[in-house]
Structures are given as C-alpha cells and as structure tokens.
Amino acid sequence: MAFQEKLIDSLGSFATKFNSYRYIMAIKASFITLMPVIIVGAFSVLISNMVLDPKNGLASFQALSFLAALKPITSAINYATLNFLNIGAVFLIGIELGRINGIKTLFPGLLAVICFICVTPTTVEMLVEGEMHVVKDVLLRQFSDTRSLFLGMFIAILSVEIYTWLEHRDGLKIKMPDTVPPNVSASFSALIPAIITTTAIATFGFVFHQVTGMYLYDAVYQVVQQPLERVVQSLPGILLLMFVAQLFWVIGIHGNQMIKPIREPLLLGAITVNMSAFEQGKEVPNIITMPFWDVYMSIGGSGLTIGLLIAVMIATKRKEMKEIAKLSFGPGIFNINEPVIFGMPIMLNPILAVPFIITPLVTGSIGYFATVMGFAGKAVVMVPWTTPPLINAWLSTAGSMGAVVTQLLCILVSILIYLPFVKIASRRVEQAQLQAASVETAKNA
C-alpha cells in the first residue's frame, strides 16, 4: 500500500510540474486551436475523393460526371489548410508563449513566423530537361507542412523567449510622448527587440549552415523528428505511449493531456501526410495516425470503456454499477468517458485498472495487424474524436468496411476482457457489504 501511495504521489507531482511547464502549455493550446483547420482539410479530402473524383468517386457515374468540375474547390481548401499547418502552429505557439510571458499582443506569433522563415532555405536547385536550374524566393512544401513541425516549434519558442527577454529591458524601448496612441507607442517599443531577435535567429541559421553544411531543418528532422516518427509509427512505440496515458488515468490524471505534446505533433503529422497522399492518388504511407488511436484504441473513450459498460450490463446484478453504466452510455457513444472513470470508479481501483490498461493495448494490436494485412484500410481523413464508433471507422478510412468490422471485433474483445474483472469487482463489493453487515450485527448484539 505504501508503494502504491508513493507511486501515485510521484506521478501526480510529475504531472503537475509537466502540465505547468510553459512550453508544454503553449504547444497544447496551439494544437487545440489548429484542430478545426485540420478537420476542414480532412473533409475536403473526403469529399474530393469520394464525391468529386472522376475515377473513384460519385463523379465516375455518367449522370453525376458534372461533379468532377468542382474538384478544384476542394483542392484549394486542401492546399490552404494541410499544406500550411506548420506556419499556423508556429504562429499560434508564438502567440500562446507570448501570452504566458505577459505579452498580450499577437506580435510574438508574427515574429515567430518571420524567424522561422529566416532559417528556412528559399533557394532550390531543380533538374529540368537534364539541366540544373536555380530557383530563388520559393518556400518548399516540406517547410510549411508537418515535416518541419519540430523545427517550427523550436524556432517559435526560441524567438519568443529572446524577444520577451529583450522586451523587458527598458533601455531597448523607444519611448514615445504620452500624446501618441497606445498601439502606435507599443509598435515602436517592440521595434528594437524585434530587430535584435530576427537578426539573432537569422545569424544562427546562417552560421549553422556554414559550419555544418546542413540547414537547421535537416538537422532537426534527422536527429529529432524522424527518430520519434519511427518510434511512434511502430507498434511497440504506440503501445508504450498508450500505456503511459492509461497509467496516468488510473491515478486520476488526464492521461491524454499528459502525452498530448508528444502524441499530437506526430500523429496529426502522420494523418496529414496520409491525407495529402490520398488526395494526390499516391500510396498512403502511415498506419498509426490520430484516427487510428481513436478508432482502435479509444472506442467509447480511453480504455475502451464501451466494453466495460456492456460487460457491466451482462455480468453483474449490482444496481449501482448498472445505473452508472446506463448514465455513462450516452456520453460514451461520443467517446466521453469521465463519468465511468470517476463514477464506477476505475481511478484507484486495482481490479478495473488492469483491463483499463490492457484492453487498448490488445485492440491497438488487432487494428495494427488488420491494417498491415490489408483487411482494414489506412486512415486518410481526420474526423472529430467525438464521432461515434463505426461511423468514425468508416469516415476516417474513406469507406473501408474492413475497418468497421475490425472496430466491431475490438469492441467484442474489450467486452470479453472486461467481463471477468467486472464479476470480480461485483463480488468484492458484495463481500465488503456482507462483512460490514456482519460487523454491524455484532455491534448491535
């Protein structure tokens, strides 16, 4: 018992410190804001390929062939949303970190974007008809989409931290008379810190390239982002991430929030790559994405508690457990399961904690191998996490019935895993009540 309490205290202390770390706060808030943009782009991909595509969509039917002429609309939406996610992330992280640092304007976000572009190569060598041509003043797609996400986060944080430090130095502020409007005065006040920050970041990028022969993008992508992508795209890697999240849930800490700074950039980046490939008719590369997590590892909410709710209705006669299951079923359909986690409870419950941790690891493995074997389609559409089961499987895979069947299998497996533990938990409650009743009877005798 002492070890359990010590573990809970240690994890709780770590979670509190982790969530209060300002860089983590800024990154989490930024990706929450970005989510609608990703979903808009996702549904444009879905409509483009399932409705407007002249080969595979509804437009392939003669009567609906006119729909193909509308495809440029969805292509434009796709380009504007998915191809500039990194720019949006840099801008939002700059704003959020600036706000945390006490700067209430939007300028830190704009400065972060400027600094990011300062370290990004804008000259490209292209082979055209056997001859090498140099093209200047272009921003390649790999620098604006999720492939440069980690570089973007690093530059946004670095530039805003430098700017904040300089902005707090009174000697660097250009002070205007009191008659000057506050917004104009603030602009002049930020001028010298902004010049120094931009120059410092641009110089850093230039010196790094001169010394190493590599751009910052190449270094960060090869050393940090690519290895992390390989880990998370592996089955052991994603299962480990899920295990950590579930462990935090069990001690009463929001597990998904704890892993969000790692999970969101990598899994949202993976689904963005898939959506772009799907839109262009190329092979979809990634199995493990944000929809994969939702469709196979979080059905009904963390721990696949939809299986627990059904198992309770099947395996126990305990009225209070059934009432909690009934009340939790409505939110559970939309993958909201705090009522069952804290009401059953699963939190700090050693019996129900075991299947709560194990079940998503099993179903994640099922989903992974079903996709590897080609039975279930890969996710190519980002759908809201509150989308009900079966619907989210069908939508996220652009109509793969194999994915729907696999998700049904995962639900069935989750019920089978939870059933024996529900029976044990029910018996424990009954034994505790009988023991309490016997003690009460002995007192009254």
Where are these regions (language model features)?
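Membrane-interfacial segments
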Residues: 47, 51-56, 97-105, 166-175, ...
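Short, membrane-interfacial amphipathic segments enriched in basic
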Residues: 1-21, 63, 168-177, 212-217, ...
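Helix-loop-helix hairpins and the membrane-proximal interhelical loops
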Residues: 22, 30, 36, 46-75, ...
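Alpha-helical membrane segments and immediately flanking helix-loop junctions
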Residues: 87-93, 97, 114, 280-351, ...
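Early transmembrane hairpin of solute transport permeases
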Residues: 20-173, 347
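Transmembrane alpha-helical segments and their short flanking loops
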Residues: 2-18, 53, 57-71, 275-284, ...
